[in-house]
Amino acid sequence: MFDATTILAYKGKNRAVIGGDGQVTFGNSVLKGNATKIRTLYNGKILAGFAGSTADAFNLFDMFEEFLEAKKGDILKSVVEFSKAWRKDKVLRRLEAMMIVLNSEHIFILTGNGDVVEPEDGEIASIGSGGNFAISAARALKKHSSLDEEALVRESLSIAADLCIYTNHNIKVLSLDGEKK
């Protein structure tokens, strides 16, 4: 349930970008090929994407946005407080979804058991069944190409879609322009 998609986020020098494929699967059947699994939060200042149960993910998006509002858009404080709530709440602990959230300064993976993980390099994160393919491609393209952030995310997701049966080529990308502080 956690794996049937691919979400990739890249916090580059000029832009923060998140992308995801559009495939929705149920067991071994494709139910939909053009779903949107990424969105902007907090008046377009935060990017987020999910892998896992769609209904659970929408609940998590809404709850996380409440924390962003309460913390006035401070992504670091919001993920910490959200994680605490996730771990304490019996209903939240049963949700089957993971999220990536990022802005121009930070990128985090929020896991299904309430953990918050900041990627080691602080720049690239992925979740879902094609996540390892996408992050491998993104790291290689970052190191050996001159692609801009959006093109790097699109190409990495395309490579993941070539390899992962739960990921398709209907790729959607969102970005935040802006300099890092």
From Swiss-Prot:
What is the protein's major site of localization? cytoplasm
InterPro entries, alphabetically?
Answer: ATP-dep_Prtase_HsIV_su, Ntn_hydrolases_N, Proteasome_sua/b, Proteasome_suB-type
Which residues are noted in the entry as Na(+)-binding? A161, C164, T167
Keyword list, A-Z: Allosteric enzyme, Cytoplasm, Hydrolase, Metal-binding, Protease, Sodium, Threonine protease
- The highest taxon in the source lineage is Bacteria
Which EC number(s) are documented for this chain? Answer: 3.4.25.2
Supply the source organism for this entry.
Answer: Sulfurimonas denitrificans (strain ATCC 33889 / DSM 1251) (Thiomicrospira denitrificans (strain ATCC 33889 / DSM 1251))
Q: From the Swiss-Prot or TrEMBL record, give the protein name.
A: ATP-dependent protease subunit HslV
Summarizing the function annotation, the protein's role is:
Protease subunit of a proteasome-like degradation complex believed to be a general protein degrading machinery.
Active site positions, chain numbering: T5
Q: Where in the cell is it found?
A: Cytoplasm
Q: What is the regulatory mechanism acting on its activity?
A: Allosterically activated by HslU binding.
Enzyme category, top tier = hydrolase
The UniProt similarity line reads: Belongs to the peptidase T1B family. HslV subfamily.
HAMAP family cross-referenced by the UniProt entry: HslV
Which reactions are catalysed by this chain? ATP-dependent cleavage of peptide bonds with broad specificity
Record GO cellular component, one term = HslUV protease complex
Q: Which Pfam families match?
A: Proteasome
User: What biological-process terms (Gene Ontology) are attached?
Assistant: proteolysis involved in protein catabolic process
Q: Which GO terms describe its molecular function?
A: metal ion binding; threonine-type endopeptidase activity
